[in-house]
Structure formats: structure tokens, C-alpha cells
Amino acid sequence: MKKNFLILIVIVVFILFSAFWSIVSEGYDKQNKSILFLKKIIPSSLAKKVRDKIFVIPNLKEKNRILNIQVKKYEQGYKGILFYDEKIKSTNKKFEANIKKFFLPFPRLDLNLGWNAEKNSKRAHYLEIVDDKIFVASGLGETIYFDKTNINNQELKQKKIFNNLENIFQKDNKIFFGIRDLFYENNYIYLSILESDEKGFTINIYRAKKDLKNLEFKLFFKSNEYSETGYNLQTGGRIEKFEKNKILFSIGFLDKYKSVQSKNSLAGKIISIDKDNLKQELVSIGHRNPQGLYFLKKKNLIINTEHGPQGGDEINFNFFSNSEIKNFGWPISSYGIPYPSQDKNFYEKNIFLKKSHSQYGFLEPIKY
């Protein structure tokens, strides 16, 4: 009887010990809702003390495990190792694509951050084909390149390119500010960069002459549009080749609700920029956060993808004409709704959010 009771006590203590360890440890199951709830209500300082004082050996093992994972990730990224290789067919069976994924020597996207997107912004990376090379820039301004033919191998064998972006970023909090796009044309590399100065944060374009050893970026285009609220997610920043000697550049509305429909402001616009004289022209207005941009020259068609409010993402077609500036409706028309966390009274006063676009003189999205 006593023996069975002792065994039961040992089992209960072991279960409680394991459960408590899973709550205070850093290597917990991020999908377990019960553990997530308990971790929220237990102060992190208390959890750390428990780990350091009571769970000394398990804590050291856990730290060692996490460290080994980090070292392995670094080694994989440093070598540019292939970790996924699969051939897939289109739904109609007419096309086949070979999908490959490689590790890169940059911080990775943390899918557990959810809507804390500002923390993920530094982990977004951008690539561009540059002649027979592929250039990659991290959100924090690290630049590398590798031969295009290396995607057929097991390793990218990338090489680092030094640059002066650290000097450009040094005045900013890197979590919130950084690269938003990478574009190459005619021996020049262009970067759209979210940065800040005494007026607030803004989106600008920098340019550097192609150099595989060192890139010296200089300010190419200054938007002179600043956020009025300090919120830095609706920035746009896409660069795309356009007609003649021009590029297209998308600028988010930067929380400037009253400026989006004004032709005297660049907030919420897609513009063209002449690369020689920097002359800018409005191409379309009424945008919230245009981050996808493509120019189909044969059709004279500008395609842009738009991040709207909840349920309001759009694909927009603009058959370009010099005689007309197209209007896509924001913030008057949108098929989205305010997010639950947003002030509905503010929305009602500043944003109309009519569902129809055409009824109010705007272009309807092709898809939303």
C-alpha cells in the first residue's frame, strides 16, 4: 500500500515538475493555448528566477539546445544551403515548376509575432536579378550576391557586398526603419528606404552604381511626405521599370487621410520619376498601401496589389494614359472594414468606406 502511494506521489510530482517547466522554459510549445495563457499571466522576471534557481540543470540544457539551433541556423545561412526541392504541376497539368528554398545569412521571419509587424520588418529580404547575378538585400541593409547558376546546386555560395547603409540607418531605430524594395536597371541599384528625420518618418529612394565589392548609396529621390501619426506600416515603397527613361514608385498613404485624394500631395499615390531630371508625375491616386507593382509594356498596363483594411486587399488594373490620372478611391471607397482594435468613431469621422467604387467616380478593383 505504502509502495503504491509513494509511486503515485512520484508520478504526480514528475507531472507537476514537467508541467511547470514547460510554462517557465523558453522552449515551450507555441501552439499550446493553455501554456500560452499561463505564460502571459506569470511575470517573465518570476519565470526567469524559477528557471535559474529551481530548474538549474534543465535550464542549462534548454539554453544549450537553443544555442545549438542558432549555431546551426547561422551555419546553414552562411553557406546558403538548399533545404527544399520539389517539382509541382499547375492545376491544369500544363506547366511544371521546380520550387527550391535556400537558407540566407539574415535573421528569419518570426511567424509567432503575428501583428507585431514592425518587429518583422527587419527580417524581410529583397532580391533582384542583376545581369548574371542575383542580388539580395536584408531589411537592415546587408547585401550579398551569388551566381544565378548556383540555384541548380546544393549551396548558393553567396558573397558579401560592403555598403554604406549603416551610415544611413544609424540615426534610426532599425526595428522600425529599413529597406522596402530593391530594383536594378542600367548598371544602377535602387533601394526604397523607410527612414526618419526631425519631421518624422518618410519613404525615399537611394541609388548606387553596381559594384560587387562596395555599394555607395546616395539619396536619389526624396518624397517629402511624412506620417502624421508615427504609424509606419502603410508606406508602399515599390519600384518598377516604366516607359522611356522612367521608373514607377508607389507611396503609401502614411496615415494622411485628408491628403490621399489631393493632387498636391504624394501620399497614397503611384508616381513616375524620370531618372535623368527627377521630374515626377502622378500616375494614380487614392491608394492605401500599394506594395505590389508591375508594368506590362505590351498592354500599357500597370498592375498593383493594394493592402486595404480588414478584407479590403485589392488587385488593381490601370491602363495607363497620359491624359488621365486614375483614382482608386481610398479612403472614401473600400471593400474592407476597420480592424477590431481601431477606433470606429475615428473611422466614421475620417474615412467613409463606401463599398462601391464606380458609384463615386473611382475605378473598381479587378479582385478584392
Where do the model's predicted regions map?
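N-terminal Sec-pathway targeting helices
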Residues: 1-14
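Beta-propeller domain segments
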Residues: 66, 72-73, 80-107, 114-117, ...
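Beta-propeller domains
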Residues: 94-104, 132-167, 212-213
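Beta-propeller fold detector
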Residues: 100, 152-168, 214-224, 281-284, ...
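Beta-rich, blade/repeat-based domains predominating
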Residues: 118-131, 171-186, 228-246, 285-301, ...
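Conserved beta-propeller blade signature
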Residues: 133-137, 188-192, 246-250, 301-305
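Structural motif
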Residues: 142-146, 198-207, 267, 311-317
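Asp-box/WD-like beta-propeller blade repeats and closely related beta-sheet repeat scaffolds
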Residues: 176-177, 199-241
